[in-house]
Amino acid sequence: RPPGSEFGTYYWNENGERVTDNLEGDDSRVMMDRVIPFIEKAAQREQPFLAVVWFGSPHRPHRAAGRFRKMYSDQPKHMRDFYGEITGMDYAVGKLRRGLRELDMHEDTVLWYCSDNGGLKNESSGGRGRKGQIYEGGLRVPALLEWPGNIDGGRTTEGPGVTSDIYPTLLDL
């Protein structure tokens, strides 16, 4: 199978064409290598943009980039890839934040980072259930919201949230 198609999933560009190049390695890098140029084009045209980036990491099959896997050489192999994917995703989010600063767009750009589901089996999200279940523990998601020019940092809320809250919250901003 070609890279990126392990689950019958493929990458597509903005023209609806299947992408087949630059798919080797960590999924987070693959995604960010496409998002940054998209944002740069919007900046050149001085147009608002919406970029929704759904990272496949960290999901099975876990395949971290070598440099991130090496950081966890003291761990069992399956955990090296798992932790390496998380590190790769962190690096990709950092690359996005740096890119926004370099384009002088960070003050006017809402960056919303959240999970797609609740916690794993051995974790507690403060509610009944876990990932894959329709109880609060499977639906409640951790999230970070950053909008430097408009929202003061350092605030937290204990209010529950789900991914379906994103759209109405953005409209309310």
What would you call each of these model-derived segments?
Residues 94, 148-149, 157-173:
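Non-catalytic, well-ordered alpha-helical segments in soluble enzyme domains
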Residues 29-43, 68-109:
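A long, amphipathic alpha-helix that forms part
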Residues 28, 32, 89, 137, ...:
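A structural signal for well-ordered alpha-helical scaffolds and beta->alpha junctions
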Residues 1-49, 55-66:
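Formylglycine-dependent
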Residues 25-29, 83, 157-160, 164:
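Short, solvent-exposed loop/helix junctions and linker helices
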Residues 49-54, 87, 110-114, 143-146, ...:
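Structural recognition of the beta-strand scaffold that forms the well-ordered cores
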Residues 11-20, 70-78, 146-151:
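Short glycine/proline-rich turn/loop motifs
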Residues 61-63, 98-155, 162:
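Histidine-centered active-site microenvironments of extracellular/periplasmic hydrolases
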